[in-house]
Structures are given as C-alpha cells and as structure tokens.
Amino acid sequence: MRLPTLFMLAAIATASPMSDLNRREMTRRQAAESCPIGYCTQNGGTTGGTAGDTVTVTDLAGLTEAAENETPLTIIVSGAISGSAKIRVASDKTIYGETGSSITGVGFYIRRVSNVIMRNLKIGQVDADNGDAIGIDESTNVWVDHCDLSGDLSAGKDDLDGLLDITHGAEWITVSNTYFHDHWKGSLIGHSDSNEGEDLGHLHITYANNYWYNVNSRTPSIRFGTVHIINNYWDNLLLTGVNCRMDAQVLVQSSAFSNCPDEAIFFADSDYTGYAVVDDVDLGGSTNSVPEGTLTPSSLPYDAIEAIGSAQIATTIPGTAGQKL
C-alpha cells in the first residue's frame, strides 16, 4: 500500500527548491485538495472551499473578513499576521498557509459549521481570551493538516487555552501531519464528564502522522469519543500522554513515545475509564494502564492508513509533521 498523497507531497516539498512561480502553483494545488485520510472522508467527505474563489490575505482584517464570509472560499495566508482576535470560521472554507507564513495571537473558532480545512498553518501564542489555537465545536467534516501549533510554557498554565480542542459532539474530524509543541494543554476531546448526552456516539476523530513535543498533557485527552491514533510520535512530554476517559474507545497503532513520564496511555480525572486497543506501540519505558477496548482496524469505516511501524516513527515523523508543504 502506498503512503497517502499528502504524506508524499510533504517529502517532495522539502526535497528540492523551486521558483516562486512554481511555489505559487504548488500552493494553489495543495490548497485545492480534499481530505484523503481518516474520519473526515466520511459523511460525504471534506472539500473545504474548493467550490468557491481563491483569495490571498496578508493582515488580520483581511483574514477575518475572508474566514467569516458565508460563501465557499479558499484563503491563502501570506506573510506574518499577528494580533489579538478570535476568528469564527464559516462553512466551506479552506485556510492554507504559504510556506513561511505565521499567525500569532489569533485563535480560530469552528463552531456549528461544516466542511472546513485548516492546512499548513503556523499558529502560536493564542491568549486564553481568544480561545484555542483551533477550536472545533458542534461541527462536522473538519480536516486539520500540516499545522504547527504552539504556545508558551513560560506563561501561566491558564493564560493560554488548548492547541486543538474538539468538543460538543463534533463529528468526522481528521488531524494529520501536525506538530504540537511547547504548551501546557495539547488537544482535548470532549469538554466535560457531564456532556454524555451530546458527545456519546459522536466525536469520531483520526490522529495520523502527528508529532507531540514538549507538551505537558492532553496529547490527547479523550472523553466519550471514538478515536484512531496512528503513526504518532510523543517526545519529551512533561506530565502525561493519551488520557482515555468516560467510555472513550481508542485505537493506537504504529506509534512511539520517547523521554516521557510513566503514564503514556492511561486514565485519570474522570468518573470512569475509557478503553484502548494498542498495536505496535513503543512505550519507551512508559506504561499503558487502560483496559482493552473494542475499536480495531477492521471496524474503521475508511480506507486503511499505512502503518509506518513503531521502529521508524522517531526518524520519520519529526521530518514530516508541521508546516512542511
């Protein structure tokens, strides 16, 4: 089985330089891609803004106006954008970062919408008043790919919110090739033990080919969801790894932990445990203490994702995850 197209494109993009004209053409082609991997291929698929026009934005005002526009749109972020804002992303959007672009202090709120792609974005230091770097709430069919999400460990734990939170029954989400780093709170799935009525039976999420480095906890923390984690690498976690809570069903495959505390796959801080099937995972001396679950590769509704193999994860994933397109 061949590697997914998005994985191969990352390798090609880093292998050789190209002219500005070719780079712009590559950017437009990649910004027009639909999600090919994981749960966001379900429910009709995730195409983002491909049905609409393409615009390039260079400042916060332009980015906000384009992202909140109610028509389908592909938005290409160029250069460095900074400020203090919470952008409410509308349905049928692709927001794609050019190589070298960055967004500082601005959170993206994807609430009660559908068909959104966030790709090749570098987002950092979002103040808690502006929410998560990316927050997905009551939304369907969202693809987060090749993003670089970071915070600031020198700040107080509650000064910044999560890097990527998925809550309130959101469905058909894929998080792929993303670099989570230098932050207190990584990724929270399901915000409360008391939200079973909304969350149970929803929160179908794939985490594929991601790199977690120097993150304190929530890598991810999962309540109620059905979550497939494959080809992920956790390095230098500060407190804990994958927290399986509140009847969550989790499948962890072809992944590795290095330089991490004892609790790699565990349960804590909820009324009752979740469950995990763990297949070809190098715990790096850490432990898995979660009861075995029922989510298996054969029960997944989408095409198989090629497993890199735990022995190759540490030398592969850091070179491909993040803003690498």
UniProtKB/Swiss-Prot annotation:
Reactions performed catalytically: Eliminative cleavage of (1->4)-alpha-D-galacturonan to give oligosaccharides with 4-deoxy-alpha-D-galact-4-enuronosyl groups at their non-reducing ends
Compartments, record wording: Secreted
Essential cofactor(s): Ca(2+)
Superkingdom to which the source organism belongs: Eukaryota
EC number: 4.2.2.2
Coiled coil: none
GO molecular function: metal ion binding; pectate lyase activity
Active site: R218
Main localization category: secreted
Gene Ontology CC annotations of this record: extracellular region
Cofactor, how bound (note): Binds 1 Ca(2+) ion per subunit.
Classification via InterPro entries: Pec_lyase (IPR002022), Pectin_lyas_fold (IPR012334), Pectin_lyase_fold/virulence (IPR011050), PEL (IPR045032)
GO terms of biological process kind: cell wall organization; polysaccharide catabolic process
Transmembrane portions of the chain: none
The entry's keywords: Calcium, Carbohydrate metabolism, Cell wall biogenesis/degradation, Lyase, Metal-binding, Polysaccharide degradation, Secreted, Signal
Pfam families recorded: Pectate_lyase_4 (PF00544)
Signal peptide: 1-15
Binding site for Ca(2+): D132, D161, D165
SMART domains: Amb_all
PANTHER family hit by this protein: PECTATE LYASE 18-RELATED (PTHR31683), PECTATE LYASE 21-RELATED (PTHR31683:SF18)
Family: Belongs to the polysaccharide lyase 1 family.
Role of this protein: Pectinolytic enzyme consist of four classes of enzymes: pectin lyase, polygalacturonase, pectin methylesterase and rhamnogalacturonase. Among pectinolytic enzymes, pectin lyase is the most important in depolymerization of pectin, since it cleaves internal glycosidic bonds of highly methylated pectins. Favors pectate, the anion, over pectin, the methyl ester.
Protein name: Probable pectate lyase B
Biological source species: Aspergillus terreus (strain NIH 2624 / FGSC A1156)
Lineage: Eukaryota, Fungi, Dikarya, Ascomycota, Pezizomycotina
